[in-house]
Amino acid sequence: GAGTSGRLGIVDASECPPTYGVPHGMVIGLIAGGDSAIRKAVEFAEDDPTQAWKDLTEHDASAKDIVIGIAASGTTPYVIGGLKECQQNGVTTGCITCNPNAPISAVSDFPIEIVVGPEFVTGSTRMKAGTAQKLTLNMITTSVMVKLGRVRGNRMVDMQLSNDKLV
């Protein structure tokens, strides 16, 4: 993703290893503009339709993976370009967008369109759209971890005990 959407993908991915005991790198979040864009906007990085595939190949994306593009508007060139390349290379794709019939949905095997309506502050997607995307990401990773056997009943069975509160 780019901007808020990319940051949310990174947050969700970073929570999987300590919560479910999966290896770092099993769930990866990428943001247009690279890691420096996590804390400070890298202007125009989202406009490059070729960079996402370059970023994905650095992580050895293959037909064994699923790549989920996150774009509130559903029009971000970085995300759409990455999903197109994934499909051309046999990688299963999904997307999370907040606009119906968005261009990103056309390049996704499994599109998720969450219609939240206009933001209170026009042009900002970190409010309703961002909240809806975060909830959806949590549902996806939780369901995957349940299917992978990382949850029994309602308990995380491979959680990494990393502080006194958890021990």
Task: Identify the residue ranges that each predicted region occupies.
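Proteins with a high burden of low-complexity, intrinsically disordered sequence enriched in S/T/G/P/A and R
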Residues: G1-A2, S162
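Internal, active-site/partner-interface "lid" segment
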Residues: N138, T142-V167
